Amino acid sequence: MSLDINQIALHQLIKRDEQNLELVLRDSLLEPTTTVVDMVAELHRVYSAKNKAYGLFSEESELAQTLRLQRQGEEDFLAFSRAATGRLRDELAKYPFADGGIVLFCHYRYLAVEYLLVAVLNNLSSMRVNENLDINPTHYLDINHADIVARIDLTEWETNPESTRYLTFLKGRVGRKVADFFMDFLGASEGLNAKAQNRGLLQAVDDFTAEAQLDKAERQNVRQQVYSYCNEQLQSGEEIELESLSKELSGVSEVSFREFTADKGYELEESFPADRSTLRQLTKYAGSGGGLTINFDAMLLGERIFWDPATDTLTIKGTPPNLRDQLQRRTSGGN
């Protein structure tokens, strides 16, 4: 992984009681040792794989103002991180989920893009076996379950200040409250809605195949093509590119998919992040409620699975063997 750390600082928030978060600030930056680089690379990997919300700085954002001064050389990175940790503490203390943790500020470069990553990581206790096969206590940073994380694409922010996607953050374990917390701390407003872009794409694909007068099998093949392309982009960490997707669908209609979306006013960006849960609807039907969970391949609708909208009845012909076995055992009086 081609990741280079420019500067990295660690501080700590300690929850002493229900009212107070104590601030512990480092007096120096961390050295970018191999261990530190590996840790940041893992955090970058984990963060990149998660669904994120997008935003942009408001004009009044204090963090943006101080970050801009730091980028211009008027404030050093350590002082910037110490002051920002203080503001972070003040915002986090407003919420009941405030547990403290290790606060990380890292300015790094990955594939010619500069980022500022801000994270609050839990420092957990565990056990380890030493070289003498003795069991000793140890501590570790819980990177895989980090959910208070934000990242600023510094390159995008400075070269394209009108962008609505240079700032990202995770939605976290308590849903909207974590999003609100980061909005307040970052001084940000909502930006690109990736989920809405993906929903718009799905609608455009359905309308595109309908206008091309494709039969059911052909429509499903197109949906599978779109899913395969989008999933490849997702797995490689790349965005959905309308131009590239349009080339994938070049034989479907005389009108290109890109021209179709532009003419019909779908308001899709030229490129946007893939949303896994939304894209899954291209190939599957899924839903749950009232103690019932149903998930099946889209190609089965009309073949083995039939829906009557008049009575809202779903008929399944041929149940999965393991389900059938359970039904048979229960109805025959077995366990």
From Swiss-Prot:
Any one cellular-component term (Gene Ontology): bacterial nucleoid
One Pfam family of this chain: NA37
Annotated localization: Cytoplasm, Nucleoid
GO terms assigned for molecular function: double-stranded DNA binding; single-stranded RNA binding
Residues in the signal sequence: none
Keywords from the named record: Cytoplasm
Family under the similarity heading: Belongs to the YejK family.
Protein name from the UniProt record: Nucleoid-associated protein CKO_00588
Species: Citrobacter koseri (strain ATCC BAA-895 / CDC 4225-83 / SGSC4696)
